[in-house]
Amino acid sequence: MDSAFSLSARHEQVLQATIRHYIATAEPVGSRALAQEYNLKVSPATVRNTMGLLEKHGLLYQPHTSSGRVPSDSGYRLYVNRLMSPSLQVGRRVDAALSEELDWMGRSLEALLKEATQILAQISGYLALVTVPQSNTVLIRHIQLVTVEGGQVLMVVLLDSLATQSVVVKLPSLTPSTPETAPEPGSRDLELLSNFLIHHLRGRPLADVATLNWDELDTEFQPFGALLCQALTNLAQRSQGAETPQFVVSGLAEVLRQPEFSDAQRIQAIVRLLEEDQAQLWPLFFATPPLANQMLNGLDIHGLAIKGVDVNVWIGTENPLEPMQGCALVVSNYTRRDTAVGSVGVLGPTRMVYENAVAVVKSAADYLSTALS
């Protein structure tokens, strides 16, 4: 494409109308229908010439020689970056639905995320995916030491993902005594130890136990530092060792209504990716698509974010995974204390209502960020 080419207002108007027609109908459109349907206030011949120029520069194409034109992946990319705005109405609907239907009291984060994906799938009409925070991003909320049988102590760690980790620790007597008369650890002693751990570890990941200065313990508790440190270290290692990227997914029935997913082989490949190869999806949820901020067929769209919205959109062949190359994936990170801990996404055809999809994802990410903080 000629690097000197730049879109005029008419080019943008015709491209936008073509894309909106195709999103609504899944059918190619000709110049006459486009001029009449969208009141472009120019003749069909002018529209035809403009569509031809857009095709020349890779933004439209003809699926068949006798048919009208449809948008290419590059056309969608330009539309997403320059010509559309997220739907405020849909965003408000998502926020209201999540606020009204999710009950955060006494439920695990995974259960809440599962319910959230069902809401997002229903509103968007696409497949909804949410990543579960991994242990290296999950912070300690509370620690409690409780006496159990045999003079042992149960250490319970509550994470701010609402998950719990626990380990049994064999502590020696907390007060001087002979082995025969050694009492079980006193509740007051365990409370003091719990408070020490909470003071130093609340708001930090499990992995930070290695940096804890046990010398700050009162002298009488010093013998227990190494045992407690080892117990916490074992918890952290156990959590990280069992960890795999995890997605909560909902809405397969929704996306199957789209004509692009009537191909059994295509949908089987996507389902296989979601069920068996989730680790391959992980980078797409935490990276920027290659064409989001660079030259597009010679047309400089650098810096044209989605009008200030912190959302990434992977369109068609921008997706590195072959089963996804006929799809669009819209994703946004949710945060805890300004650190990204997970991501929300919707997956559908490239012929996606991007205004709605971006609004759904961004509103959901904002809601989760606020709830977790």
Residue map of PLM features:
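N-terminal intrinsically disordered/low-complexity leader segments
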Residues: 1-6
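Residue-level marker of regulatory loop/turn positions in helix-turn-helix DNA-binding domains and
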Residues: 7, 27, 259
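Short, leucine-enriched amphipathic alpha-helices that occur as contiguous helical runs
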Residues: 7, 11-15
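Contiguous, well-ordered alpha-helical segments that form the cores/surfaces of helical PPI scaffolds
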Residues: 15-20, 329-331
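N-terminal helix-turn-helix
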Residues: 17-20, 28-84
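Cationic-aromatic interfacial patches
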Residues: 24
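Intrinsically disordered, acidic Ser/Thr/Pro-rich low-complexity regulatory segments
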Residues: 87-373
